[in-house]
Design a protein with these regions (language model features):
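Short, well-ordered beta-strand elements
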Residues: 3-17, 35-41, 109-113, 137-139
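Ligand-binding "clamshell"
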Residues: 3-4, 70-81, 168-183
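Flexible hinge/capping segments at coil-to-helix
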Residues: 96-111
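Pocket-lining segment of extracytoplasmic ligand-binding domains
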Residues: 145-187
Length: 187
């Protein structure tokens, strides 16, 4: 029988929470139900939302609820069809292990990473700024691999990631976690 095709935009390839589509495709789960997925990876929820809103894809996965609700409130033709996570405990912000930055309150004038404009990480960084009265410089850095490179090379002071990304660097004491997404009261 012919498979129905769905084109998905999925943010942050390799994160645990964004692997469901790819794992399901490889395991034949979607095929068993008459579906074939075409998966397009983005650098974050902002790009995922843009792809879905423009009609470039059928579904945006891990699109960031705060950004989606904001887009909906502005009249974008979006609908939430399922929750991926509750809260933002899967996201974390980190520094190089030898950084003098010990907490978010030490980030004055420092660069504070988020993935893309309109993403959950952007919303959380914005919430950090307001909640803690920070004077950091929010900076879009894309996905976790590029962000880590920027942190380790000194281009960015505070990076962001989601497991499993960065766990090796954490175990090897190359990086140190400063905050979780749940440290933003709005999330």
């Amino acid at each position: 029988s012919a498979q129905d095709k769905l084109k998905l935009a999925v943010g942050q390839r390799g994160n645990w929470d964004t692997s469901v589509s790819e794992v399901g495709q490889r395991a034949g789960i979607f095929k068993k139900h008459g579906l074939e997925l075409e998966i397009v990876y983005t650098q974050g929820a902002g790009e995922t939302q843009q792809a879905a809103i423009s009609g470039g894809v059928d579904i945006g996965v891990a699109a960031g609820i705060m950004g989606v609700l904001s887009a909906y409130a502005k009249g974008a033709p979006v609908r939430v069809i399922g929750a991926e996570t509750t809260g933002a405990s899967d996201l974390y912000w980190y520094v190089k292990a030898d950084s003098p930055i010990k907490s978010l309150k030490d980030t004055g004038g420092k660069t504070l990473a988020y993935s893309t404009n309109g993403s959950s990480t952007h919303g959380i960084v914005t919430a950090f700024m307001k909640q803690y009265g920070l004077s950091a410089k929010p900076t879009a850095t894309g996905g976790p691999p590029g962000t880590l490179t920027q942190v380790m090379s000194g281009q960015i002071d505070i990076g962001w990631a989601a497991p499993p990304f960065g766990l090796d660097q954490l175990d090897q004491k190359q990086i140190r976690i400063l905050a979780s997404g749940n440290d933003a009261a709005a999330f």
